[in-house]
């Protein structure tokens, strides 16, 4: 039996609408949010996901300060936690500690129950927010997995299992890519360009997000303007603009403008625009505590906002990044995945992650302009997002960071 495991990770964020948010939360508390308060399993893992997100981001930022960054910490962590169910020894410890979990402070059962609740919440039907996540387990038809591993990934991570003919690599590649394309509504195609010949198992995670802003920009107001990629490079981008009430303030600690935009439903995007020359300071200074404080304490001001339309993507081979976070053994010949199968020693030969982010003017109602047109308060700020900035998208019910990124060039795919 071939002795390697090929692991593919996938994410999609399709953010099709952008607009100013509202300070007030939805007036009526839904049954879903009540259940989340009563069963806060995902809340226990949320701080660790946030720390993992920033650690992962900083590794990517150190690798290059001239390219866009976009990934889903939830997607990556879910796949790693699911894989950990079949690992033992140092391989097992490295994965969970790499995800910022302290096994002396949190029971492993609580970790997996947290992910179980997270996935249940993300996949709950919502008429206002399209948010779905899926885990696929593609198993060579000749490979016998241990019953406990198969039962756990299905019950805790809602994973689908597919019998796959990995001896025909092209057929297997197409099967996996079709699963991903369907799950991401056609936004990500051909995730796997090739498949190793000794692959016997593939773990695939995807997430699809499409949100509408509570109050959209007016498309007729969008104009071509300069975006300063760096001191020497300027590109022309469609720049949206709007006069209205925004959750916007300047944070002296981060030397950055902080803008929060609410989606219809239960998600918020935080955009961090550093002062000129302060991107490295922002990246080194921002913490999960600061971001949480922003979400809890929001001020509303009348402002003129200019924001670029964005269409970017990120594709990553995760080996190098995860190795920098201490997750190394699972990729080596010393990997212990004996909890997956007893038939042969396995190692992870491939770890892929892809994310796509689209932002434009669209919203649910054009009436937002009328409401904002009646605001008579004094204009306080004029802020132009015409240079690189960070973005973090949170899901409120689980208190988890769905996506993290840096927009260096809004037009660069």
From Swiss-Prot:
Q: Which GO terms describe its molecular function?
A: serine-type endopeptidase inhibitor activity
User: Which organism does this record belong to?
Assistant: Tamias sibiricus
Annotated glycosylation sites: 65, 102, 165, 266
Membrane-spanning segments: none
Signal peptide segment:
1-24
Q: Does the keyword Manganese apply?
A: no
- Which residues lie within the region annotated RCL? 368-387
Tissue specificity, in the record's words, reads:
Expressed in liver.
Keyword set, alphabetical order: Glycoprotein, Protease inhibitor, Pyrrolidone carboxylic acid, Serine protease inhibitor, Signal
Looking up Gene3D superfamilies in the UniProt record yields: Alpha-1-antitrypsin, domain 1 (2.30.39.10), Antithrombin, subunit I, domain 2 (3.30.497.10), Serpins superfamily (2.10.310.10)
Protein family membership = Belongs to the serpin family.
- In Swiss-Prot or TrEMBL terms, this protein is called Alpha-1-antitrypsin-like protein CM55-SI
